Amino acid sequence: MEETVKIITVNDTTEIHIRKSEFQGNTYVDVRKFFIPETGEPQPTKKGLSLNPGQWEELIPEIKEVIG
């Protein structure tokens, strides 16, 4: 099961998708860049990060510290 939670438009050819998914009974949150071709659906790129909720809880405070 995969659910898109949020889509952030970067520009005409790029979006960032935040998705929640389950794999082998585990929950993951994936933040990934998508390329938007002139015709067709947005396509995922290799640029992204998929972590379980506990890993995101550890990472988010560190990101907040870096960006101030």
Language-model segments: which ranges?
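Negatively charged, low-complexity tracts enriched in Asp/Glu with abundant Ser/Thr
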Residues: 1-11
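Gly/Pro-rich active-site loop or hairpin
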Residues: 9, 47-49
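Short linear motifs in intrinsically disordered/low-complexity regions
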Residues: 12-13, 52
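Generic detector of short, locally flexible boundary/turn motifs and exposed helical patches
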Residues: 13-17, 58
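A short, structured beta-strand/loop element
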Residues: 16-47
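Mixed-charge, Lys/Arg-enriched low-complexity segments
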Residues: 49, 53-68
